[in-house]
From Swiss-Prot:
Protein name, entry field: Nucleoplasmin-like protein ANO39
Native source organism of the sequence: Patiria pectinifera
Residues bearing the modification Phosphoserine: 145
Pfam families per UniProt: NPM1-C, Nucleoplasmin
Signal sequence coordinates: none
Sites where a glycan is attached: 85, 264
Domain of life: Eukaryota
Amino acid sequence: MSKEFFWGDSLTGTKKEVKWNPSLDDEDDFDNLDSDGIQHFLFLKQAVLGANAKEGERNVVEIETENFDGDNVKQPLFSLKLGLNESSPLDIGIQPPVTFILTAGSGPVFLSGQHMIEISADDEEELEEDDEEEEEEDEVEVNASPDLPVAKSKKRPLSTSDGTAKKTKMAKLDKDADKKEDDDEEEDDEEEDEVMAMMDDDEDDEDDEDFEGGEDDEEEDEEESDEDEDDEDDNEEEEEEDEDEESPEKPLKTTAKGKKGQMNGTTTAKGDNKPKAKAKTDTKLVKGKAKKKVLALDEIKGKLQESSNVPKKEEKFKNYVRSAFHISEAKKLQDLWGWFRASLQK
């Protein structure tokens, strides 16, 4: 522990020396401390020439103290002159004993600084105990003073019981307050858990919607491809009909046209050919679907990169790939998932 105090003194023509050597005998606050447990330091900060100094007179101040070896040392500290340099900043820390001497001039020269007292940890505890004992003694003296009314001394035990009751009540209030804080914290934690659970549910719903949206897109693509194949089959049928009309068997069709009664037969013949065309179309669709199932991993990766509705969770991703690309092999699914997860981290 350390304490700091302001320090100041002056040197004049009649007071040429100032000694600084504080001791425990002069300190009322440290009566019970050892001299080894306390240290004094003086930090000089400023030297100022007084207003009554003589013009043109040089004032020289010398310091006398002990060095590390315990030898006596004398050294000029500063020099002041009115009109030239009337003050001098200082930054010197010294320990007692110290003597300041005005070796030249008549002053006045004013010294100022900081007096710091360092107290060891053991002595600090003793000092605190002494302070507590003094406070208790003061309270006892006040209570035992004859100047106090008798009624007050009689009421003291009651005040003590009241104080105990107040302390008990305060302790109970503190306990209730702590319990209430704990309850509030638990409620806050529960609310946070509920919010997090709701957020997770929302994310799952979004992933499900994305997955369903991806399946719908795939089904639409398949329907469009089927429609395109149907259109191609219809075009092929029309071309075949055109070729039949241009073939050498044209007189037979002309005869059929001449006889109106046989139009139904001709229509029936054309109708008999249509189911065969439809069967061809179904065969082509089956072949087209079979080709779709056999997709290379690079093609699947390309489609996944183009799609914006791919789920970002492993299980949903695998379900999506199974449904969209008809892949059931666990190794391929795991490879695709590893590639997709790496692409997300880029």
